């Protein structure tokens, strides 16, 4: 199991990916402790001096004007967690819960939240023991933070609700006991610090980004395979074309195609003197379209990496000045907009792949047998596989609708503009699954097309991509049950079978 020392505010994208993919043993860097303790001392001073400060000794939301007596402060924090745990929907999987928990720890340990080290260490202990709170997928609008999901996370700290331990759903109290842990009692401000933040929204969008990176790389490989299968030209990938435009994403994608295709191949030599002048856009404009998608991926990475390391609590404790200041860092608009932009890229990656599949079906465009199978009529070949790809591409067009332009006021109009970032991030998962299905069909089709080129071969890397598929899925000599082949190719893509052929592009 990977051991990671967490220096608050310094998580890298590769660390976040590892946290999502694998269980982790966390330890907090000692450099964070003084800042954490100073923020707690500031909160304690405010309570001792009888000063009024939002979230410490007041109600919440529209009830912020209500002053809470000192003897009720501990109960206030517990009540806050219980009342806000109002999510619905299927539970998030362990990987997503783990990522949310680490993001929460990373934010709290920055020392602006007034939460004790012992509570942060209790969260770390949950991660290290593999105790995963039951967090329903729905119920947050992404402002004031992800209240419901983070409340469900916090329930387990209190010994309330349910949690998963070693694959079994248990009452949280039981899960804690089996893991050798104890519930905690929250002090002033700690419940609010746990609940306020964009960690669920950010984790949802990060998963979308991680999947989009795999899809992008896989689509570039399959696009290169299709270029070979239909006797496409390498000329559109000439570096001079892309330098003339100056779009960095486009320049970098053209470089990836040159890397995959190399200068020539047996297939390329077979049509070196053909009379075609230009290829269809789905081949010729791959650097332009995929370059625009790459730009979106890179911009999304910058926004989400900043948010993953951000303090999105409210109010914030500035211990050096002895002040607690209310603001709006919990508003997840940056995450929502980033997720919306990422949705466009995921949709377009799939849409372009589907067009290349359609091109291969047309014997006039591909110079291959109709639907990529011999003895057509008796055999239907890839006819309906392309229809499936079209259905998935169409679904993604609807799912790509922006969520950040939507808002519904909540909390009696105190919270009158919200981000809808959780929904913006969560729909990326379905979009990614759809696009992966499309790319799987293209991989199957392109390899079939190259097979039909009478023993001619492509470049070494593309032959490796074909061999990887052929080790699991046989060439189509006649019709057979098609769905298992799509399922197999999809699983290989999800495992990074094609992504590893592409140099780092982020």
From Swiss-Prot:
Keywords: Cytoplasm, Histidine metabolism, Lyase
Coiled coil start-end: none
GO process annotations (BP): L-histidine catabolic process; L-histidine catabolic process to glutamate and formamide; L-histidine catabolic process to glutamate and formate
Main location: cytoplasm
Subcellular location: Cytoplasm
Cellular component terms per the entry's GO annotation: cytoplasm
Cross-link 5-imidazolinone (Ala-Gly), where in sequence: 143-145
Family matches, as InterPro entries: Aromatic_Lyase, Fumarase/histidase_N, HutH, L-Aspartase-like, Phe/His_NH3-lyase_AS
Keyword flag Iron: no
Pfam families assigned: Lyase_aromatic (PF00221)
Enzyme Commission number: 4.3.1.3
Molecular function in Gene Ontology: histidine ammonia-lyase activity
Origin superkingdom: Bacteria
Broadest EC class assigned to this enzyme: lyase
Pathway: Amino-acid degradation; L-histidine degradation into L-glutamate; N-formimidoyl-L-glutamate from L-histidine: step 1/3
Keyword Cytoplasm: yes
Cystine pairings recorded for this chain: none
SUPFAM superfamilies: L-aspartase-like
Family membership: Belongs to the PAL/histidase family.
Database matches in PANTHER family: HISTIDINE AMMONIA-LYASE
Protein name per the record: Histidine ammonia-lyase
């Amino acid at each position: 199991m990977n051991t990671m020392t967490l220096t608050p505010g310094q998580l890298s994208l590769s660390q976040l990916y590892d946290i999502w993919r694998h269980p982790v043993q966390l330890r907090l860097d000692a450099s964070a402790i003084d800042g954490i303790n100073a923020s707690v001392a500031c909160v304690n001073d405010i309570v001792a001096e009888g000063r009024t400060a939002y979230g410490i000794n007041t109600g919440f939301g529209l009830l912020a004007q209500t002053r809470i007596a000192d003897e009720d402060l501990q109960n206030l924090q517990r009540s806050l967690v219980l009342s806000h745990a109002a999510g619905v929907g299927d539970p998030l999987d362990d990987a997503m819960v783990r990522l949310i928990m680490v993001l929460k720890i990373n934010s709290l340990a920055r020392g602006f939240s007034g939460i004790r080290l012992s509570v942060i260490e209790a969260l770390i202990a949950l991660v290290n023991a593999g105790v995963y709170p039951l967090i329903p997928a729905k119920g947050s609008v992404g402002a004031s933070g992800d209240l419901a999901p983070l409340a469900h996370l916090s329930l387990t700290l209190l010994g309330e609700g349910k949690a998963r331990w070693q694959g079994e759903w248990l009452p949280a109290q039981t899960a804690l006991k089996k893991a050798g842990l104890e519930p905690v009692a929250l002090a002033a401000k700690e419940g609010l610090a746990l609940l306020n933040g964009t960690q669920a929204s950010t984790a949802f969008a990060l998963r979308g980004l991680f999947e989009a990176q795999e899809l992008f790389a896989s689509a570039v490989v399959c696009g290169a395979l299709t270029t070979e299968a239909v006797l496409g030209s390498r000329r559109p990938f000439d570096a001079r074309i892309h330098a003339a435009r100056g779009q960095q994403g486009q320049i970098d994608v053209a470089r990836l195609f040159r890397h995959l295709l190399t200068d020539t191949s047996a297939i390329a030599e077979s049509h070196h003197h053909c009379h075609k002048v230009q290829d269809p856009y789905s081949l010729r404009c791959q650097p332009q379209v995929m370059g625009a998608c790459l730009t979106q991926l890179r911009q999304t990475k910058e926004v989400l990496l900043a948010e993953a390391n951000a303090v999105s609590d409210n109010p914030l404790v500035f211990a050096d000045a002895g002040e607690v200041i209310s603001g709006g860092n919990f508003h997840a608009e940056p995450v929502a907009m980033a997720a919306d932009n990422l949705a466009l890229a995921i949709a377009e990656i799939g849409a372009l792949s589907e067009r290349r599949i359609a091109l291969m079906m047309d014997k006039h465009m591909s110079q291959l047998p109709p639907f990529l199978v011999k003895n057509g009529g008796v055999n239907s070949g890839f006819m309906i596989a392309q229809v499936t790809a079209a259905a998935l591409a169409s679904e993604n067009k609807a799912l790509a609708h922006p969520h950040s332009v939507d808002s519904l006021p909540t909390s009696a109009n105190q919270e009158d503009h919200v981000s809808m970032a959780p929904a913006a991030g969560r729909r990326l998962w379905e979009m990614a699954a759809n696009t992966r299905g499309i790319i799987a069909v293209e991989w199957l089709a392109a390899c079939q097309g190259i097979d039909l080129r009478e023993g001619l071969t492509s470049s070494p890397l593309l032959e490796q991509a074909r061999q990887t598929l052929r080790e699991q899925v046989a060439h189509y000599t006649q019709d057979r049950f098609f769905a298992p082949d799509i399922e197999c190719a999809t699983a290989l893509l999800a495992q990074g079978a094609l992504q590893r052929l592409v140099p780092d592009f982020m």
